[in-house]
Structures are given as C-alpha cells and as structure tokens.
A protein has these predicted regions:
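Helix-loop-helix
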Residues: 1-247
Length: 247
C-alpha cells in the first residue's frame, strides 16, 4: 500500500525528471551569463549615462555570445500551470482528508508542530514544518541561481539579493496555513532541483568549454534573430523617438 505522502513525492520526482532538459538548458545559460559578467560591467560603466545605448550594447553582447538572459525564468513559467493545478487541488482533495504522512496528520490541511498561543499577523497561531523546509530549499535554490546572474544590477531590474530573501519569506508566511501536501511538493521539488543542478555543475557541464565557446561566438558577427532582434529594434525605435522629441 502506497501512502499519499509517498505518492506526492513520486509525482514530484516524475515532474522534475520531465523538467530536467529545461533545467539543464537554463543552468547552461546561467553559466554563460556568469562568464559575461565582466563584459556587462564594462558596458554599464561605459554607458552609465545612456540607458538606451547600454541596453543596445548588452543585447548585442547576449546575441553574439549565444546567451539568453530570460532563460532562467523558463522553468518557473512552465511550472505555473502545474502550480495553479496543485494549488487548487490540495485544499479540496477529499482523498487527502485525514491522510497522514510523517508528522502531518492531514495532507489537505497545515502540518502544525507547535501551537504558539498567540496570533502573528499573516502567519497564524502555529508553526508548520513543511513550509519551513520548503522555504529553506527555495532559499538555497534561489541563492544558487542568482549567484550566476550578471552584476551590476541593471536600472529598472529587481534586486536579485532582495528576491533571494523575499521569496522564501513569502513562502513561509503564505503556506503556513495551507495544505501540507503542497508544501511537501515544493520542498521535494526544490530539493531535487538543487541536487540536479549540483550534478549538472560537477559532472556534466565543463565551464572551460562553455567559456571558450562564448569567446568564439563573441568574435563572430551574428545577426540578431527572434526575440533579440525584436527587442533591439524596439530599443532603436525608442532612441529615434527620443531624439525626435528633443528637436
């Protein structure tokens, strides 16, 4: 007989395995962004008073190097439908009612391990353990991914260090009163992702080869295509309108 907690873990493993090719491509792109960090810093310093030109040169660098700054968001975007489905499913799932797993007495409700005796606004009057574990896993996952992001921070872009602390904190507060089954899913999901990224980094990806490939790509003229071309064209149009407005 397979407990529902184990079933959630098995489902999470299947989802993560299906997502592994996307995770791999995303992590490779993050490595590329890390390699490009000195170039991006140089561009930011050179065009610190010209935001449009800075964006143009940055996008040109991404295109020539074969890097995609948005690739890190792809896994999260793909998982949005899964998250929405699970978010709607767990609290109302009758099959999970009164189904225990480890310290959780009911996977469709929160897994309180401590009653505080008083209420904390937006948090509750108890402490749930699965949200804490999920928050810790999210923190380390975010730390691993934001560590590959280029610095300095681009104007108008969110501060990644703030996000690194804000996301786990939001998880902790939001899920403390939510179904423990969902917190279990997120804990296992992020834990598996961390393990997968460690394996990719240490046993699959060769940073030296990636660096050499980027340097080779940067030396080749490459015509922008797709999203990069449209974005660069939009930047150029904005620059033209800006100049026209000054006349």
């Amino acid at each position: 007989f397979l407990s529902y907690g184990i079933a959630i873990i098995v489902m999470t493993i299947i989802v993560r395995l299906l997502m592994s090719p996307v995770t791999y491509k995303s992590y490779v792109s993050q490595i590329k962004m890390k390699v490009l960090r000195p170039d991006i810093e140089a561009i930011s310093a050179k065009y610190k008073d010209d935001a449009v030109k800075r964006q143009q040169e940055t996008m040109s660098l991404y295109t020539r190097a074969g890097a995609n700054p948005m690739s890190g968001c792809i896994p999260a975007l793909i998982q949005l439908p899964v998250f929405y489905a699970l978010f709607s499913f767990f609290p109302v799932a009758f099959v999970l009612r009164d189904k225990s797993f480890l310290w959780a007495d009911d996977l469709s409700s929160y897994d309180s391990i401590l009653d505080l005796g008083f209420n904390i606004p937006f948090y509750g009057d108890h402490v749930s353990l699965f949200p804490i574990l999920a928050s810790v896993a999210i923190f380390f996952y975010t730390k691993m991914t934001t560590g590959q992001q280029p610095m300095p921070q681009q104007p108008g872009m969110p501060n990644m260090k703030i996000i690194m602390y804000l996301m786990p904190l939001m998880m902790l507060f939001f899920f403390n009163n939510y179904a423990s089954g969902l917190s279990l899913y997120y804990f296992v999901s992020n834990l598996l992702t961390i393990i997968l990224m460690i394996v990719i980094k240490n046993y699959i990806i060769d940073d030296t080869k990636i660096h050499a490939q980027i340097e080779e790509n940067k030396s080749k003229p490459k015509k922008p295509g797709g999203f990069s071309a449209r974005l660069q064209k939009a930047i150029e149009e904005a620059e033209k309108q800006k100049k026209a407005g000054r006349r």
